[in-house]
Amino acid sequence: MGCGMSTEEKEGKARNEEIENQLKRDRMQQRNEIKMLLLGAGESGKSTILKQMKLIHEGGYSRDERESFKEIIFSNTVQSMRVILEAMESLELPLADQRVEYHVQTIFMQPAQIEGDVLPPEVGNAIEALWRDAGVQSCFKRSREYQLNDSARYYFDNIARIAAPDYMPNDQDVLRSRVKTTGITETTFIIGDLTYRMFDVGGQRSERKKWIHCFENVTTILFLVAISEYDQLLFEDETVNRMQEALTLFDSICNSRWFIKTSIILFLNKIDRFKEKLPVSPMKNYFPDYEGGDDYAAACDYILNRFVSLNQHETKQIYTHFTCATDTTQIRFVMAAVNDIIIQENLRLCGLI
C-alpha cells in the first residue's frame, strides 16, 4: 500500500503554504509601506505639507476641488481683516483715513463662514480700501500681539484677483488656505517603490490625546516647527510662547518609549516669515541666551541646536531641514531627500546595510 497523502492532508498543506505565502507578501508590503506621522504644534504647517504631496505626487487639484476651496479662502480673508480691525480697537489704533470707516462696518457685518462662488464686490472693495490704510498697516505690523492667520498679507495683496467674478483658486491660494485640523486625516501617495501613508493629527493641545491611535508601527515621524513663531503666544493659551511649546512637545516625542526605534525628520518651517521678522523682533527678547542678533544663519543654528540637543538617545539621529511649506519646488527637493533617508533606514532595519 502506498503512503500518499490523504485529500484532507493535501488541503491542510495547501492552506499552510497559502498562509506562509500571505505572510511573506504582508512582510514585503510592510517593508514597502511607509507609515509617516505628521506631528507639531498647531499652525506649524502640517496640512500644507499634505497639500504639497497632492500637488507633487497626485497630479494636483481638479477644477471641482479648487472650487471647493473658494469659501475657505473667502472666509480666511474676511476673518483676517476682522481680526486686525478688532485688534485696532483693543490696541487703540485709529484708522488713518476716516473716510474708510464705512468699510469697517461691511467687514463686521459678514458671517464667520462666507458662502457662495463669488466674494461680494462690496467685501472685496472694503478689504482693498482698508488694506491701503496706514492705520491698518500699522496694526498689521504688530500682529505678534494678537492671533492673525499667516496668510493674511498674501490674501490681502491678491484681493483684486480673489474678488473677481471669474476667480479660480491657484496652487498658492489653496496651499495658504487654513482650516483647523480636527481628528486624524490620512493621505496615501507613492514615491518610487514606496507607498506612503501620511497621517496628519490636530496640533492644538485639545487634539493631542488622539495621537495615541497612530503610534503603532510608525516608520517615521515628520515633526514640524514654525520657527517664525518665536515671538508669538499659543492660540489656546496666551501665556505660553509658541516656540517653547514646540520644544516641550518635541522633547516628549523624541524621547518617548513609543519612538525609540522610529526615525525623526525635523522640518524647521516658515523660514520666509522668520527671515522677515528677525530684524524687527529681536529673538533675544524671547530667548535671553541667544547672542546672534538679527543674523539669519546664527538664528537658524541656535534654533536647530535647541531642538536637536533635546535628543537623549545616542544612537538616534534627527534629520533636519529648513523649509518653506508653501514653496512647492523646495518641498519637492526636500521630500526626495526624505525618501532617500527612509530607504536607508529601511535597509538598516532589514539588516541589509
UniProtKB/Swiss-Prot annotation:
Biased composition (Basic and acidic residues): 7-26
GO cellular component: cytoplasm; heterotrimeric G-protein complex
Region (Disordered): 1-26
Region of interest called G1 motif, as start-end residue ranges on this chain: 35-48
Region of interest (G4 motif), ranges: 265-272
G-alpha domain span: 32-353
SMART domains: G_alpha (SM00275)
CDD domains: G-alpha (cd00066)
Domain of life: Eukaryota
Database matches in PANTHER family: GTP-BINDING PROTEIN ALPHA SUBUNIT (PTHR10218), GUANINE NUCLEOTIDE-BINDING PROTEIN ALPHA-5 SUBUNIT (PTHR10218:SF302)
Family statement drawn from the similarity comment of this UniProt entry: Belongs to the G-alpha family. G(q) subfamily.
Descriptive protein name: Guanine nucleotide-binding protein alpha-1 subunit
Organism name: Neurospora crassa (strain ATCC 24698 / 74-OR23-1A / CBS 708.71 / DSM 1257 / FGSC 987)
